[in-house]
Amino acid sequence: GRGAEEARAAIAEGFTSVMFDGSDLPLADNIRLTRDIARIAHDNGVTCEGEIGCVGYAGGTASARTNPADAAEFALETGVDAMAVSVGNLHLQQGQSGDIDERALAAIAIATRGRVPLVIHGGSGVPSVQRRLLARTTPVCKFNIGTELRQCFGTALRQSLADQPTEFDRIKLLSPTEAPLVEAARKVLREMKGIGS
């Protein structure tokens, strides 16, 4: 979310985790706002993720890499439970052609001294082999793979519409998307464990 009110609303609705993205703000403002939201979350038994360094978009907004010293200050001052970083990852990347800068990630891990688990937004673009390596050997605890799953959903929905051109019942149209999405998520988890596809 983009502010304390969104975080409060999510907490009031029963969410168990909130994410605040102040990465486009000056460092001091990002720290202050993220710290405030983390306090609200923690006071309600909810975890909070923050972001430092701006993760750009494939074919769009450019990224701003996470500075290790800033990451250390952010982790220490905000009290977040997880911290999203920008190390070559991009949102909306189709296909696994991306490449995480492992040296930059290692520098952040050293600077933060293991104070906070790290998160990779734009994880759909990270090759499976690299995701597995990072999950096993770095403080990365979460990869966001929304693009990967949305592509699967889109393919399944288009097939459902083609198979049922006169159907109008949304449940009948959307039901065939569930199994492919579940299998896509399971495939990612199997690959993380090194079980194969």
Summary of predicted features, one role per range:
Residues R2-L118, R131-P139, L157-R158, G194-S197:
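Alpha/beta enzyme core
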Residues E51, G88, I120-G125, I145-T147:
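Glycine-rich beta-strand-to-loop/alpha-helix junction loops that act as flexible
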Residues S128-S197:
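C-terminal alpha-helical cap/extension of soluble enzyme domains
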Residues G1-R2, S124-V126:
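Short beta->alpha connector loops
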